[in-house]
Amino acid sequence: MNSINIAIDGPASSGKSTVAKIIAKNLNYTYLDTGAMYRCATYLALQHGYEAQDVSKILGLLAERPISFGKAEDGSQTVFLGTEEVTLAIRQNDVTNNVSWVSAIPEIREELVNQQRRIAKDGAIIMDGRDIGTVVLPDAELKIFLVASVDERAERRFKENQEKGIESDFETLKSEIAARDYKDSHREVSPLEAAEDAIEFDTTGVSIEGVVTFIQEKAEKIIDMKN
């Protein structure tokens, strides 16, 4: 059966990763969490006190401790830097609040985009991020751009943090998400924007199942047309 590549983009906490993981499982596709890759670079930078001008040192650390993905016993995805599992460490608030400046460094983006393209070259990949449809996989057969209100996204992030045992304040999350939106959409390199041929879907008030159904039906239609 012919497979396709699926690109899902959108701002922070728009539901990209949750939806992408479910669709990947349903279609037996590989899910690539590009956001986790930028979080890994951010985690390394913070661990060593590096700033934007230390790009060569951050790239050196990424070469020494390559990013890889695994699966936990419950089937959830795990993230590694070298031999260290960083699945939860890269979701801490300090990483979340610094990932924008790290992901805006052109050399970091170039390195991670090249890694992402290598993984996707054989197809049957579902990838989520902020520039998948525009930069990483411009030839993806299906491109989705998810949006949602700041309030809704802050509520999702608050619940996620609670489930992971991460302390957070709802109003602080709202302001952080709004600030992240501004940074992501105004950066010089690969700003957050929908690809011209992307299907935009507002997930405000829509259940996860509803979003999954919307995207999966479109994916299956394209797959059927290829076979």
Curated annotation (Swiss-Prot):
UniProt name for this protein: Cytidylate kinase
InterPro entries cross-referenced by the UniProt entry: Cytidylate_kin (IPR003136), Cytidylate_kinase_dom (IPR011994), P-loop_NTPase (IPR027417)
Enzyme Commission code: 2.7.4.25
HAMAP family in alphabetical order: Cytidyl_kinase_type1
Family named by the database record: Belongs to the cytidylate kinase family. Type 1 subfamily.
Organism per entry: Streptococcus agalactiae serotype Ia (strain ATCC 27591 / A909 / CDC SS700)
A single MF term (Gene Ontology): ATP binding
Mitochondrion in keyword set: no
Gene3D superfamilies, sorted: P-loop containing nucleotide triphosphate hydrolases
Keywords from the UniProt entry: ATP-binding, Cytoplasm, Kinase, Nucleotide-binding, Transferase
Superkingdom of origin: Bacteria
An individual GO BP term: pyrimidine nucleotide metabolic process
NCBIfam families reported in the protein's UniProt record: cmk (TIGR00017)
Pfam families: Cytidylate_kin (PF02224)
Compartments reported by the entry: Cytoplasm
Ligand binding (ATP): G10, P11, A12, S13, S14, G15, K16, S17, T18
Reaction(s) this enzyme catalyzes, per UniProt: CMP + ATP = CDP + ADP; dCMP + ATP = dCDP + ADP
One Gene Ontology cellular component annotation held by this UniProt entry: cytosol
